[in-house]
From Swiss-Prot:
Gene Ontology terms, MF aspect: calcium ion binding; calcium-dependent phospholipase A2 activity; phospholipid binding; signaling receptor binding
Active site: H74, D120
A Pfam family this chain is assigned to: Phospholip_A2_1
Protein name: Acidic phospholipase A2 2
Amino acid sequence: MTPAHLLILAAVCVSPLGASSSRPMPLNLYQFKNMIQCTVPSRSWWDFADYGCYCGRGGSGTPVDDLDRCCQVHDHCYNEAEKISGCWPYSKTYSYECSQGTLTCKGGNNACAAAVCDCDRLAAICFAGAPYNNNNYNIDLKARCQ
């Protein structure tokens, strides 16, 4: 092994990516996170990952409030995007722009990317307009989401 190969191997092993114990975030979720941070800079995007009955993985029952309803609509939007041939919203990346809290899905996205971008954009805008109730974070799904 040449010194150059050893240097590259060492860089990968000690880099933040190589040393990370957490799984990498799918690129689409990373983009959605950034959209949320664009429209709601005052809150951590993580606050929306386990909120109500629909924000986070899955979803069932009646949304607990307007913010949870934003997530329910987002879930349905992804379901519609999945009807586009070969479209998997959770891994589909897209081109967009955030400028002073305004999100724009760029032209040039294919049909799937355009649909997913619009789903994420509308959800992030909805989050910005809905009140956040701390009592609806990390709720008992079995008790409240029937």
